[in-house]
Amino acid sequence: VGLLLSNAGYDLVFADVADALIEGLQNSESYSVHEVGDDPRTTVVRGYSALNSAKQAAELTDAIARADVVTTAVGAHILKFVAPAIAAGIAARPAGAARVAVMACENAINGTDILKAEVERNYSGDDLADRALFANTAVDRIVPAQAADAGLDVTVENYFEWAIETPPFEG
């Protein structure tokens, strides 16, 4: 999903609690996505930042408050742990700002509904619907087992599909 958003012109901010991953991203100007299959190619992703969500909570809140899109790819069982940070970022959005699109890109049916319920539990205001929209997604991209020495680089199959429900964007 990061590659797709980067190719669409979005600035990426990665957030995780894994020190080694975040430090690696912070200390590198780029990472490569190796697409394998009928039309193999390598794309270098640049222009991103990375935050340790356990150690840089204020910075993460600010990043979410300024974001156009927030996606997760952590596993459906982890959504309850990332929801407080997302709720804090939504609450910090300036009044009148466009709604942030929140999408859980998980291997779960209606993963965004799961995330939305967790965000609602952590959101104290009554204006969540004015500040955020939540759209379920289905991501179809096979990510084979990665080589132990791959570092930040990732190998994926070149076929992909990212279906996003449209009703939350209507109106």
Predicted features and spans:
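Substrate/ligand-engaging "lid" and interaction regions
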Residues: 2-61, 66-67, 71-74, 78-171
